[in-house]
Amino acid sequence: MTQNENPSAQSGAKPEDKARPAKALQGVKGMNDMLPADAPLWEHFENAARAMLRAYGYQQIRTPIVEHTQLFVRGIGEVTDIVEKEMYSFTDALNGEQLTLRPEGTAAAVRATIEHNLLYDGPKRLWYTGPMFRHERPQRGRYRQFHQLGAEALGFAGPDVDAEIILMCQRLWDDLGLTGVRLEINSLGQAHERAAHREELIKYLEGFKDILDEDGKRRLYTNPLRVLDTKNPALQEMAANAPKLIDFLGEESLAHFEGVQRLLKANNIPYKINPRLVRGLDYYNLTVFEWITDKLGAQGTIAGGGRYDPLIAQMGGKAAPACGWAMGIERIIELIREEGVVPDAVGCDVYLVHQGEAAQQQATVAAERLRDAGLDVVLHATPDGKSGSFKSQMKRADASGAAYAVIIGEDEVAAGVVQVKELRQGAQAEGGGQQAQVPAENLVDYLIDAMVGASE
């Protein structure tokens, strides 16, 4: 190529193409980022949830995001909406296995319990949290990736534990300051009772074939209970007059349900019996429940659960009773916002302001010593690597939410001192909010004493 030849001209590329910035990539629709501004609300929820779970003696379990597809087909039910049309499934290119991004947490928790023989020494109370995935149209309160908190009480058969898992939710609502969340409960009885009801229900629904929507027709013979869970306004009267499962329950199932209600009443938990409440998963029996709010529109269910005694044996484990709940964290975060609950602002303890190379070095050492003492410290830094003026740095310090600013310049380095300035109301540095000069070697003790004074 000669010196005058233009390689871009030979390739057909236009010179201006090289200067065109790359198109910014976007996240997947329905899979949302949690940004720093959202973090205080999430931390507020997570801290309250962990404290509540600890109060009831639940231990955390963590399972993989990806499981074998068959786990959910067998665990959730082959004719459920989740398995039929909402799962993110794929074939593993390495070995041809059918795998799925988990759409819910109970099946995986039960799988882990069986695989690791967790019930060998008695019942267990477990909890989990993490992202779940469902392939559906994103809308308010319903996302393709969402976060779930769940609790599972494994190996307990009595209505006392059914009541306990409901009380856990109520305690969390109280701790979060949520109001207007109502409880609906029902009993699905046992398999033979549901079979007798199913026979009568199918006969009843066959008389309405002409008005059933597509979902109703599809479920009529595979999962008729779910037909009653319709949101179609045109089918509400039909659903309301359908044979009620509770009328088919035997003495044992009724006694269990009455036991749950008795304990809820004893704890002053108001509830409504909803005979059409069936939940969307096939593994439930006996008690089912939902916590509902009117403040989130159509997606008003913020938590739900119940008893699933057959599931452990159904998934290959030794038969054991079980019950639990799950709640959608994004919906609860939105409800916290609707309620106007404002968590305490989270700021650092100290913001370190510095100017000059020697001051930067001393500030770095001071920051590490303060962190060694357990303080949260932000060391000033800028995109261009220059420290900036003291005035601009102090603006950053104010905005950080720090209780104190520690200021180090060339004069301070030469004198072996630092300046400590109170930034936030309630900080108790000597001088009552004024700026104090402190020997550099005494900085840690000075700030710890000041912060102890602020907390008294």
UniProtKB/Swiss-Prot annotation:
Region feature (Disordered): 1-22
Keywords for the protein's UniProt record, in alphabetical order: Aminoacyl-tRNA synthetase, ATP-binding, Cytoplasm, Ligase, Nucleotide-binding, Protein biosynthesis
Superkingdom of origin organism: Bacteria
GO terms, biological process: histidyl-tRNA aminoacylation
CC terms in the record's Gene Ontology section: cytoplasm
Compositionally biased intervals (Polar residues): 1-11
EC number assigned by the record: 6.1.1.21
InterPro entries hit by this protein: aa-tRNA-synth_II, aa-tRNA-synth_II/BPL/LPL, Anticodon-bd, Anticodon-bd_dom_sf, His-tRNA-ligase, HisRS-like_core, HisRS/HisZ, HisRS_anticodon
Catalysed reactions listed for this entry: tRNA(His) + L-histidine + ATP = L-histidyl-tRNA(His) + AMP + diphosphate + H(+)
Keyword Aminoacyl-tRNA synthetase appears in the UniProt entry: yes
One GO MF term attached to the UniProt entry: histidine-tRNA ligase activity
Major enzyme class: ligase
Xref: Pfam families: HGTP_anticodon, tRNA-synt_His
SUPFAM superfamilies: Class II aaRS ABD-related (SSF52954), Class II aaRS and biotin synthetases (SSF55681)
Subcellular location: Cytoplasm
Gene3D superfamilies: Anticodon-binding domain (3.40.50.800), Bira Bifunctional Protein, Domain 2 (3.30.930.10)
Cross-referenced NCBIfam families: hisS
Oligomeric form and interacting partners: Homodimer.
Family: Belongs to the class-II aminoacyl-tRNA synthetase family.
Protein name per Swiss-Prot or TrEMBL: Histidine--tRNA ligase
Gene: hisS
